[in-house]
Amino acid sequence: GDRKTKTHSFTCAPWQAPTRSDNCEQCSDLAPDGTCYESLCRSLGKNCELINGEDPIFAECISGSINDVAPPKITPWAELIQGQTDKFGVSYSYDVVSGNPGGYVINPDIDSLIPFNFGVQTNEPAQCRYDTELNTSGYYEMTHEFDQGSLLVKDHNFTLILPGNQDYDFYVRCVDFYDNGENDPPFLIKFSTKDEPDRQPPIILSTDPLSGSSVAYDINQTPVI
């Protein structure tokens, strides 16, 4: 019979990541050990950005855009707040506060001198800070970090032990990978602490030197701070 010949040519070239990818979030699933890393994230799309790369537990590949100008949306962390109870077993709740600034108020009054965990959530990975006074200087001038520090995450919390018979306003700002939200109006966490006698014994939070630490040779005692 008739014989036909076809010639195919192949060239090896560097991988070109797709211009726009919806697969950035698959990075951890594709990584051999489940930990996303920079080169793998970048290979999934030109719009893919690795965040929290210094911490393998929180490393994440997100779909970014230089045209993203939307600030993180801040909401109460409902499960965290409502999962706590006062010393009488009453569950805490919150009411949304509208206006400027908007936020939430915690009910009932918080127990004094007992740790309370405050929290907010964001609709995208972000980092958050708070102040006890309203300032207009922006995110990076705020004093207090949440427990997550500079990590870009969606769940944010911090724990405080506060004196009784006080009213508090905490002003929160959060920024995303592109610093959106830096100068936005803050989110308000409003609450009061119970007016009650202080019957709580002191709690030792830390010591220096730490328990079990080594001391210099031939030293039998050392000051404890």
What function would you assign to each model-found segment?
Residues 130-132:
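Conserved aromatic beta-strand anchor motif in extracellular beta-sandwich/beta-rich domains
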Residues 1-127, 138-163, 169-180, 185-187, ...:
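Extracellular/cell-surface secretome signature
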